[in-house]
Amino acid sequence: MAGHSKWANIQHRKGRQDAKRGKLWTKIIREITVAARAGGPDPDSNPRLRMAWDKATDANMPKDNIQRAIQRGAGGADGANYEEVRYEGYGIGGAAVIVDCMTDNRTRTVAEVRHAFAKNGGNLGQEGSVAFMFKHCGQFVFAPGTAEDVVMEAALEAGAEDVTTDDEGVIEVICAPADYAAVRQAFEAAGLKAEVEGIIMKPQNETELTGEDAVKMQKLLDALEGLDDVQEVYTTVVFDEAQ
């Protein structure tokens, strides 16, 4: 994969997310509300809420906003009646795409997702059409220069499944979703902070796109991520370092 840089792809995605901070806050608030409704208002006993809380903190969301979202969810107030829906489809070059949504209107959401795919050269698939290409797991990615031995020790003692370091020095830790909170706590205790972390759908194989195909795929991803009901978009695509 000449020109393919994991770190460049990570930074590229983070840059896109930072540019959409207002929308990111909306999505995090929705996640906090749903998590509090499903598992209660205490992040210490609700791992999903803890993860959403941490996302909010990383996005510099004021604590008052977080608390209001928790209260809405725990109290069953207006705005908490969302359901989670997953859509699967294909992008440029047959690249697999998973779109996770929270919605109060499935009919609206599927129409918007289908339109985004169709307008940007992709197509919405059937349930199960691409999910097998991804692994549901916890992921932590550390920047080049992070002490590999410290990461390795903390990760494995906390039950992580795999620790890998690429040629750039990017360290990736993978764990079972159920072990995510324990691994995160182990990193905190060791004074480590991941550049990217979360429970994700990790592609088992990658599709590298360059040139015009990469531009078209980026437009598709932007269109999907820009939809109000979309929480996360996962894809098998990696972009050439020059994109």
Curated annotation (Swiss-Prot):
Pfam family of the protein (one): Transcrip_reg
GO CC terms, sorted: cytosol
GO BP terms: regulation of DNA-templated transcription
Keywords: Cytoplasm, DNA-binding, Transcription, Transcription regulation
Ranges for region Disordered: 1-21
UniProt-recorded name of the protein: Probable transcriptional regulatory protein Bpet3099
InterPro entries linked: Integrase-like_N (IPR017856), TACO1_YebC-like_2nd/3rd_dom (IPR048300), TACO1_YebC_N (IPR049083), Transcrip_reg_TACO1-like (IPR002876), Transcrip_reg_TACO1-like_dom3 (IPR026564), YebC-like (IPR029072)
Coiled coil segments of this chain: none
Family: Belongs to the TACO1 family.
Entries under HAMAP family matching the protein: Transcrip_reg_TACO1
Subcellular location: Cytoplasm
TM helices/strands, residue ranges: none
